[in-house]
Amino acid sequence: MLIQLICQAPQRAQELEQIAARWQLQASDDSPFALVLSEERLELRKLDEPKLGAIYVDWVEGAVAHRRKFGGGKGQSIAKAAGLNKGVTPVVLDATAGLGRDAFVLASLGCRVQMVERHPVVAALLEDGLQRAKQDDEIGAWVSERISLLHASSHDALQQLASDPNFTSPDVVYLDPMYPHPENKKKTALVKKEMRVFQSLVGADNDADALLEPALQLAQKRVVVKRPDYAPWLGNRKPSMAMETKKNRFDVYVIAAMSGE
Protein backbone atom coordinates (compact mmCIF):
# COMPACT_ATOMS: atom_id res chain seq x y z
CA MET A 1 0.00 0.00 0.00
CA LEU A 2 1.16 3.53 -0.80
CA ILE A 3 1.41 5.89 2.17
CA GLN A 4 3.67 8.68 3.39
CA LEU A 5 6.25 7.46 5.89
CA ILE A 6 7.51 10.12 8.31
CA CYS A 7 10.07 9.55 11.04
CA GLN A 8 10.16 12.24 13.73
CA ALA A 9 12.78 10.40 15.78
CA PRO A 10 16.00 10.08 13.73
CA GLN A 11 17.28 7.19 15.86
CA ARG A 12 14.19 5.17 14.88
CA ALA A 13 14.56 5.59 11.10
CA GLN A 14 15.63 1.98 10.60
CA GLU A 15 12.71 0.82 12.71
CA LEU A 16 10.28 2.64 10.41
CA GLU A 17 11.89 0.94 7.42
CA GLN A 18 11.39 -2.43 9.10
CA ILE A 19 7.74 -1.64 9.82
CA ALA A 20 7.19 -0.70 6.18
CA ALA A 21 8.88 -3.87 4.97
CA ARG A 22 6.97 -6.13 7.36
CA TRP A 23 3.58 -4.76 6.36
CA GLN A 24 4.46 -4.16 2.68
CA LEU A 25 3.98 -0.40 2.84
CA GLN A 26 5.52 1.76 0.12
CA ALA A 27 6.49 5.37 0.67
CA SER A 28 4.57 7.86 -1.45
CA ASP A 29 4.50 11.63 -1.12
CA ASP A 30 1.19 11.71 -2.99
CA SER A 31 -0.83 9.87 -0.36
CA PRO A 32 -3.09 11.96 1.90
CA PHE A 33 -2.27 9.51 4.71
CA ALA A 34 0.95 9.32 6.68
CA LEU A 35 2.36 6.81 9.13
CA VAL A 36 4.38 8.85 11.60
CA LEU A 37 6.91 7.28 13.96
CA SER A 38 7.67 9.53 16.91
CA GLU A 39 9.69 9.01 20.08
CA GLU A 40 6.61 7.57 21.77
CA ARG A 41 4.60 5.65 19.19
CA LEU A 42 3.44 4.97 15.64
CA GLU A 43 0.46 7.02 14.52
CA LEU A 44 -1.73 7.55 11.48
CA ARG A 45 -2.53 11.03 10.23
CA LYS A 46 -4.77 12.30 7.46
CA LEU A 47 -2.65 15.16 6.18
CA ASP A 48 -5.39 16.95 4.27
CA GLU A 49 -7.49 17.10 7.46
CA PRO A 50 -4.99 17.97 10.20
CA LYS A 51 -7.74 18.88 12.68
CA LEU A 52 -8.59 15.19 12.94
CA GLY A 53 -5.31 14.66 14.77
CA ALA A 54 -3.47 11.37 15.11
CA ILE A 55 -4.86 7.86 15.43
CA TYR A 56 -2.86 5.31 17.41
CA VAL A 57 -3.31 2.31 19.67
CA ASP A 58 -3.09 2.99 23.40
CA TRP A 59 -4.07 0.30 25.87
CA VAL A 60 -2.09 1.76 28.77
CA GLU A 61 -3.88 5.08 29.31
CA GLY A 62 -7.08 6.81 28.27
CA ALA A 63 -10.46 5.27 27.52
CA VAL A 64 -9.28 1.68 27.18
CA ALA A 65 -7.47 1.73 30.52
CA HIS A 66 -10.51 3.30 32.17
CA ARG A 67 -12.74 0.59 30.75
CA ARG A 68 -10.39 -2.11 32.04
CA LYS A 69 -10.55 -0.67 35.56
CA PHE A 70 -14.17 0.48 35.73
CA GLY A 71 -15.96 -1.13 32.79
CA GLY A 72 -18.02 -3.72 34.60
CA GLY A 73 -15.78 -6.77 34.30
CA LYS A 74 -17.43 -10.01 33.27
CA GLY A 75 -20.84 -8.38 33.66
CA GLN A 76 -20.44 -6.26 30.52
CA SER A 77 -22.24 -7.32 27.36
CA ILE A 78 -19.19 -8.33 25.35
CA ALA A 79 -18.10 -10.67 28.15
CA LYS A 80 -21.53 -12.28 28.36
CA ALA A 81 -21.70 -12.63 24.59
CA ALA A 82 -18.34 -14.41 24.58
CA GLY A 83 -19.54 -16.75 27.32
CA LEU A 84 -17.40 -15.52 30.21
CA ASN A 85 -20.42 -15.53 32.50
CA LYS A 86 -20.46 -19.33 32.18
CA GLY A 87 -17.46 -19.61 34.47
CA VAL A 88 -14.97 -20.11 31.64
CA THR A 89 -12.33 -17.95 29.96
CA PRO A 90 -12.52 -19.00 26.31
CA VAL A 91 -9.81 -18.78 23.68
CA VAL A 92 -10.91 -16.05 21.25
CA LEU A 93 -9.98 -15.24 17.67
CA ASP A 94 -10.79 -11.59 16.95
CA ALA A 95 -11.00 -11.72 13.16
CA THR A 96 -11.56 -7.96 12.64
CA ALA A 97 -9.28 -6.52 15.30
CA GLY A 98 -9.09 -2.86 14.22
CA LEU A 99 -7.42 -0.90 17.04
CA GLY A 100 -7.80 -3.89 19.35
CA ARG A 101 -10.08 -2.39 21.99
CA ASP A 102 -12.45 -5.34 22.24
CA ALA A 103 -9.59 -7.83 22.07
CA PHE A 104 -7.91 -6.00 24.94
CA VAL A 105 -11.09 -6.02 27.03
CA LEU A 106 -11.51 -9.78 26.55
CA ALA A 107 -7.84 -10.39 27.37
CA SER A 108 -8.09 -8.22 30.48
CA LEU A 109 -10.86 -10.57 31.65
CA GLY A 110 -8.61 -13.59 31.24
CA CYS A 111 -9.15 -14.75 27.64
CA ARG A 112 -6.31 -15.67 25.33
CA VAL A 113 -6.95 -13.61 22.20
CA GLN A 114 -5.43 -13.95 18.76
CA MET A 115 -6.04 -10.84 16.66
CA VAL A 116 -6.37 -10.75 12.88
CA GLU A 117 -6.30 -7.41 11.06
CA ARG A 118 -6.60 -7.42 7.29
CA HIS A 119 -5.45 -3.84 6.58
CA PRO A 120 -1.66 -3.41 6.74
CA VAL A 121 -1.68 0.16 8.08
CA VAL A 122 -4.11 -0.70 10.87
CA ALA A 123 -2.13 -3.86 11.61
CA ALA A 124 1.07 -1.81 11.92
CA LEU A 125 -0.64 0.52 14.42
CA LEU A 126 -1.96 -2.49 16.30
CA GLU A 127 1.44 -4.15 16.51
CA ASP A 128 3.02 -0.93 17.79
CA GLY A 129 0.38 -0.57 20.49
CA LEU A 130 0.75 -4.23 21.45
CA GLN A 131 4.52 -3.90 21.82
CA ARG A 132 4.18 -0.79 23.99
CA ALA A 133 1.58 -2.49 26.17
CA LYS A 134 3.89 -5.47 26.65
CA GLN A 135 6.51 -3.12 28.11
CA ASP A 136 4.14 -1.55 30.64
CA ASP A 137 4.84 -2.42 34.27
CA GLU A 138 1.18 -2.82 35.17
CA ILE A 139 -0.27 -4.79 32.25
CA GLY A 140 2.79 -6.00 30.31
CA ALA A 141 3.00 -9.50 31.79
CA TRP A 142 -0.55 -10.61 31.02
CA VAL A 143 -0.69 -8.76 27.68
CA SER A 144 2.41 -10.71 26.58
CA GLU A 145 0.85 -13.96 27.73
CA ARG A 146 -2.65 -13.52 26.33
CA ILE A 147 -2.59 -11.36 23.18
CA SER A 148 -1.01 -12.09 19.81
CA LEU A 149 -1.37 -10.61 16.31
CA LEU A 150 -1.66 -12.34 12.96
CA HIS A 151 -1.66 -10.25 9.78
CA ALA A 152 -3.87 -11.51 6.97
CA SER A 153 -7.15 -10.83 5.27
CA SER A 154 -9.79 -12.08 7.67
CA HIS A 155 -11.30 -14.38 5.06
CA ASP A 156 -7.97 -15.92 4.09
CA ALA A 157 -6.86 -16.15 7.70
CA LEU A 158 -9.92 -18.06 8.83
CA GLN A 159 -9.58 -20.54 5.99
CA GLN A 160 -5.82 -20.87 6.41
CA LEU A 161 -6.14 -21.48 10.12
CA ALA A 162 -8.91 -24.03 9.61
CA SER A 163 -6.62 -26.05 7.33
CA ASP A 164 -3.55 -25.77 9.58
CA PRO A 165 -3.15 -29.05 11.52
CA ASN A 166 -1.08 -27.27 14.18
CA PHE A 167 -3.71 -24.63 14.90
CA THR A 168 -6.08 -25.24 17.78
CA SER A 169 -9.49 -23.88 16.88
CA PRO A 170 -10.67 -21.08 19.17
CA ASP A 171 -13.69 -21.46 21.39
CA VAL A 172 -15.04 -18.15 20.10
CA VAL A 173 -14.60 -16.23 16.85
CA TYR A 174 -15.39 -12.53 17.29
CA LEU A 175 -16.39 -10.32 14.35
CA ASP A 176 -16.88 -6.56 14.31
CA PRO A 177 -16.91 -5.56 10.63
CA MET A 178 -17.02 -1.89 9.76
CA TYR A 179 -20.52 -0.72 8.93
CA PRO A 180 -21.59 2.61 7.37
CA HIS A 181 -22.68 5.03 10.08
CA PRO A 182 -25.73 7.23 9.39
CA GLU A 183 -25.07 10.90 9.91
CA ASN A 184 -28.10 11.24 12.18
CA LYS A 185 -26.60 8.87 14.74
CA LYS A 186 -24.73 10.51 17.60
CA LYS A 187 -21.09 9.53 17.93
CA THR A 188 -18.36 10.50 20.36
CA ALA A 189 -15.73 12.84 18.96
CA LEU A 190 -13.10 10.09 19.09
CA VAL A 191 -15.23 7.52 17.28
CA LYS A 192 -16.29 10.11 14.71
CA LYS A 193 -12.65 10.96 14.01
CA GLU A 194 -11.55 7.36 13.75
CA MET A 195 -14.48 6.33 11.56
CA ARG A 196 -13.89 9.23 9.21
CA VAL A 197 -10.23 8.35 8.79
CA PHE A 198 -10.74 4.60 8.64
CA GLN A 199 -13.61 4.69 6.17
CA SER A 200 -11.56 6.82 3.80
CA LEU A 201 -8.48 4.62 4.32
CA VAL A 202 -10.02 1.16 4.53
CA GLY A 203 -13.55 1.58 3.20
CA ALA A 204 -16.59 -0.30 4.45
CA ASP A 205 -16.39 -4.07 4.83
CA ASN A 206 -18.49 -4.75 1.73
CA ASP A 207 -17.58 -8.43 1.89
CA ALA A 208 -18.28 -8.75 5.61
CA ASP A 209 -21.16 -11.18 5.06
CA ALA A 210 -18.66 -13.70 3.72
CA LEU A 211 -16.88 -13.78 7.09
CA LEU A 212 -19.68 -15.56 8.91
CA GLU A 213 -19.49 -19.00 7.29
CA PRO A 214 -15.73 -19.57 7.78
CA ALA A 215 -16.07 -18.20 11.32
CA LEU A 216 -18.79 -20.76 12.07
CA GLN A 217 -16.58 -23.52 10.68
CA LEU A 218 -13.60 -22.44 12.76
CA ALA A 219 -15.17 -21.72 16.15
CA GLN A 220 -15.70 -24.61 18.53
CA LYS A 221 -18.32 -23.00 20.77
CA ARG A 222 -19.77 -19.82 19.29
CA VAL A 223 -19.39 -16.88 16.92
CA VAL A 224 -20.07 -13.39 18.27
CA VAL A 225 -20.87 -10.58 15.83
CA LYS A 226 -20.89 -6.97 17.05
CA ARG A 227 -23.31 -4.81 15.06
CA PRO A 228 -24.67 -1.27 15.34
CA ASP A 229 -28.21 -1.40 16.70
CA TYR A 230 -29.62 -0.39 13.29
CA ALA A 231 -27.64 -2.95 11.23
CA PRO A 232 -29.16 -6.17 9.85
CA TRP A 233 -27.88 -9.61 10.82
CA LEU A 234 -24.60 -10.52 9.19
CA GLY A 235 -25.33 -12.51 6.05
CA ASN A 236 -29.04 -12.19 6.89
CA ARG A 237 -28.57 -15.14 9.22
CA LYS A 238 -30.61 -15.11 12.40
CA PRO A 239 -28.47 -15.54 15.54
CA SER A 240 -29.17 -17.95 18.38
CA MET A 241 -29.52 -14.95 20.68
CA ALA A 242 -28.70 -11.26 20.82
CA MET A 243 -27.51 -8.94 23.57
CA GLU A 244 -28.31 -5.26 23.15
CA THR A 245 -26.52 -2.23 24.52
CA LYS A 246 -27.36 1.45 24.04
CA LYS A 247 -25.74 1.65 20.61
CA ASN A 248 -24.69 -1.86 19.64
CA ARG A 249 -25.92 -5.43 19.48
CA PHE A 250 -24.00 -8.65 19.99
CA ASP A 251 -25.44 -11.41 17.79
CA VAL A 252 -24.40 -14.80 19.16
CA TYR A 253 -24.35 -17.93 17.00
CA VAL A 254 -24.12 -20.89 19.36
CA ILE A 255 -22.37 -24.01 18.06
CA ALA A 256 -21.87 -25.90 21.32
CA ALA A 257 -22.34 -25.25 25.02
CA MET A 258 -19.52 -23.53 26.88
CA SER A 259 -17.74 -26.00 29.17
CA GLY A 260 -19.13 -24.26 32.26
CA GLU A 261 -22.73 -24.88 31.21
Swiss-Prot record:
Location, primary (coarse class): cytoplasm
Source species of the chain: Vibrio cholerae serotype O1 (strain ATCC 39315 / El Tor Inaba N16961)
Protein name: Ribosomal RNA small subunit methyltransferase J
Keyword S-adenosyl-L-methionine among record annotations: yes
Coiled-coil ranges (or none): none
Entry superkingdom: Bacteria
Family: Belongs to the methyltransferase superfamily. RsmJ family.
Compartments where located: Cytoplasm
One MF annotation (Gene Ontology) recorded for this entry: 16S rRNA (guanine(1516)-N(2))-methyltransferase activity
HAMAP family membership: 16SrRNA_methyltr_J (MF_01523)
Binding site for S-adenosyl-L-methionine: 101-102, 117-118, 153-154, 176
Record key words, sorted: Cytoplasm, Methyltransferase, rRNA processing, S-adenosyl-L-methionine, Transferase
CDD domains named in the record: AdoMet_MTases
Enzyme Commission number, as recorded: 2.1.1.242
EC category name: transferase
GO cellular component: cytoplasm
Role: Specifically methylates the guanosine in position 1516 of 16S rRNA.
GO BP of this protein: rRNA base methylation
